[in-house]
Design a protein with these regions (language model features):
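Short, glycine/polar-rich helix-capping loops at beta-to-alpha or helix-loop-helix junctions
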Residues: 8-9, 89-97, 156-161
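Glycine-rich phosphate-binding loop and adjacent beta-alpha segment
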Residues: 4, 130-194, 230-231
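Mid-domain Rossmann-like dinucleotide-binding core that forms the NAD(H)/NADP(H) cofactor-binding site
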Residues: 32-111
Length: 231
């Protein structure tokens, strides 16, 4: 709702049974509203990356909603895991915020090229085809790249030769949030409860504050989910 068809602010909605998933959780309503689809996408990507506690992980587009959700999910289970994020340009204010959220280091991404020679065991690629070839150059041997996002505004990867581009015996996978199933949703909420994952939204607005909520989202000043609460 809100994308394929309107009605995401409705007090009551009529949905197909196939889009209704029962869950068991201790989260509040505001916290629960902050989970889908962002944490579902991050959780599926995390599973496909097969994270190990000894890994060094890169998140391209570290300030994105999925990037921050991924950070919180993996750090909740592996607090000492080294997670590095990339952001466009050298933004000291954004870097400070992201380090405060839990990233271990932030790397500048200049025109989809990382300003580092460091390589990583796992890479969550949220920029997409615009930067993925550069990610190929930063993956360790037998590492895994999960191509999940398309934030770079490029939808397809031209001239891709798996034999030549994946030089380090690396693995390339993906996760599509549209492939929703009840089992994975149950796993996600069980994981959040078991590891006490912080999923609280960054801001909560009342329905009467809907204009301010949209102004805040469109300002790109936030670093997390914004929830509109109907009393």
């Amino acid at each position: 709702m809100g994308r394929a068809f309107d009605g995401s602010y409705a007090e009551y909605t009529l949905l197909p049974n196939g889009q209704v998933y029962p869950i068991t959780t201790t989260l509040s309503w505001a916290e629960l509203a902050a989970v889908p689809e962002t944490y579902y996408t991050a959780f599926g990507s995390m599973q496909n990356l097969q994270i190990k506690p000894t890994d060094t992980v890169l998140v391209r587009a570290a300030a994105s909603g999925v990037g921050i959700a991924f950070l919180r999910l993996v750090k909740a289970q592996y607090p000492t895991l080294r997670v590095v994020g990339s952001i466009r340009g050298n933004n000291t204010e954004k870097t400070a915020v992201l380090l405060g959220l839990g990233y271990d280091a932030i790397i500048a991404d200049n025109d989809n090229v990382l300003a580092t020679d460091e390589c990583f065991d796992k890479i969550l690629e949220l920029v997409g085809p615009a930067s993925i070839k550069d990610s190929f150059a930063h993956i360790k041997e037998y590492g895994i790249i999960c191509a999940t996002g398309l934030l770079g505004g490029k939808w397809y990867l031209e001239d891709f030769d798996p034999t030549r581009d994946l030089l380090h015996n690396a693995y390339l996978t993906t996760f599509y949030s549209g492939s929703v199933n009840a089992e994975k949703i149950t796993q996600l909420f069980a994981y959040i409860d078991e590891h006490d994952v912080p999923v609280a939204p960054e801001k909560v607005f009342a329905l009467e504050e809907i204009v301010a909520a949209h102004q805040y989202v469109e300002s790109n000043a936030g670093y997390g989910k914004v929830v509109v609460h109907i009393n």
